[in-house]
Design a protein with these regions (language model features):
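Structural motif
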Residues: 37, 66-68, 75, 91, ...
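A short, N-terminal "cap"/entry segment at the start of jelly-roll beta-barrel domains
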Residues: 1-35
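Short acidic-glycine-tyrosine-enriched beta hairpin
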Residues: 73-87
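Glycine- and acidic-residue-biased ligand/ion/polar-headgroup-sensing regions
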Residues: 56-67, 72
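Ligand-binding loop in jelly-roll beta-barrel domains
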Residues: 88-112
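A cytosolic small-molecule/anion-sensing beta-strand core signal
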Residues: 63-64, 79-80, 98
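Short beta-strand His + acidic residue motifs that chelate non-heme Fe in jelly-roll/DSBH
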Residues: 49-51, 69-70, 86, 91-97
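Conserved short histidine dyad/triad with adjacent acidic residue
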Residues: 24, 39-54
Length: 116
């Protein structure tokens, strides 16, 4: 995973931040702070971001392509330009139906804790 932040004060294209790599998921960090992160991810067709559960809400924007977001057992197909908020404490994954680029934004407000 690439962790070099994007230079501040400069215009950039989200779609140009990461390239597609066959059979891979590639991530690049735009911004990383103690209060949250913004990443752009490229997902090859049929590849899946690792299933996980986050203690924070996650905003997902599909930049290009077509992807399926799974939240618990419910499927949400996304087309380019569409977005979804994955609620905190839910099992989720993202699969590229075709090659896709995704922006993921996590904002940590400080009140979240793992609920058991």
């Amino acid at each position: 995973m690439e962790n070099n932040e994007i230079e501040k004060g400069h215009v950039f294209s989200l779609a140009d931040i990461v390239n597609y790599v066959p059979n891979s998921v590639i991530s690049h960090t735009i911004l990383r702070k103690a209060t949250g992160t913004v990443n752009v991810v490229s997902v090859d067709s049929g590849k899946e971001l690792i299933e996980r559960t986050s203690p924070f809400d996650t905003f997902i924007l599909l930049i290009e392509g077509k992807a399926e977001v799974m939240i618990e057992t419910k499927s949400f197909p996304l087309d380019a330009g569409q977005a979804i908020i994955i609620p905190a404490h839910t099992r989720n994954s993202i699969v590229g139906i075709v090659r896709s680029k995704i922006m993921s934004t996590i904002i940590k407000s400080g009140y979240e804790e793992v609920i058991m």
